[in-house]
Amino acid sequence: IDIDNSINSGQVFLWEKQGVDWYGINGQDILKIDKNGMIKSIRNRKINFFRKDDDIEEIIKSISKDKIVKKAVKEYEGLRIFKQDPFQCMISFIISSNSNIQKIKSSLEKITRKFGTKVKIEGKEFFVFPKPEKIAKASIDQIKTCGVGYRASFIKEAAQMVVLKKIDFEYLKKCDYQEAKKNICRIPGIGNKVADCIMLFSLN
């Protein structure tokens, strides 16, 4: 697995390299990847962030029927799709609409600092991603201070839908592609591309 390329590919935004190690926020957890590519959860949770159960050879064989994809697979060997926290992933890609990686990263960092909980590990301070309830209760003006502009109302409504179980990530993981997409596209601010990103990066 090419860790650096995978982290910098635009799937995740709340990761930073400190020395030779990567630290990343994944929902209510902090993940650490060392120089050998070993990953651990600071909360000692069982994680499958690298999707090690996937049959990579079979997936590559299947998608390489397309010539452009085949060339990309060869050029970016070692690139992997991560399995992210669904709520964090959803908010990240609502913010991603009409934006760029630096702006997305900046807004998400502000959201975690404003609404998340501070944790200390290995002498370092981090903020875990806020729970849906925290964002659902925030005012649109409070969310706007995080640099998300017109997306503030989308973020609040998305969080409210999760709290009210109108969006149930565990249910969506069991749905087929069309059914999951239909459900996710009910959230304001989510169209085809954003829905596909959320499904690919967090809902299997």
Region locations from a protein language model:
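HhH-family (HhH-GPD) DNA N-glycosylase catalytic core used in base-excision repair
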Residues: 1-204
